[in-house]
Amino acid sequence: MKASKKMFLIDLVTLMPEMFEAFTNFGVVGRGFKKNFVDINFINPRNFATDTHKTIDDRAYGGGPGMVMMAEPLIESVESARIREKSLGIKKRKVIHLTPKGPKLKHEKVKELSCEEGLILIASRYEGVDER
């Protein structure tokens, strides 16, 4: 399946795809999905965890509060989105890590990003990503 020029392709890396699936069915956003303006693919990093417990987080190296996301499942998740890009014949998309510590996502930035063919978004709820 080739991607339509109008369709905005999103790969969303999230531990809770069910939470995001609901918003694709209602309101203005839901109409966009129904009219094929947007296509979203949910990628759960747990699918790339290597242990029996599907662990994707760990304590921060050197201590400190909170947990960090393990790099390996996150890298594999983004690589699976890159494979999707190639199969759809679209150019390499920007990867944006949405995190509480990051800058606020403002309207001007959203307008700028809307000119892209799509995005790979990482919806994080952790203190950060393991940098080891």
List PLM regions with ranges.
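N-terminal nucleotide/polyanion-binding subdomain common to many enzyme families
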Residues: 2-81, 85
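Generic recognition of short, well-ordered alpha-helical segments
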Residues: 23-27, 108, 132
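Acidic-glycine-rich active-site phosphate/pyrophosphate-binding loop
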Residues: 46, 129-132
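S-adenosyl-L-methionine/SAH cofactor-binding core of RNA-modifying enzymes
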Residues: 70-125, 129-130
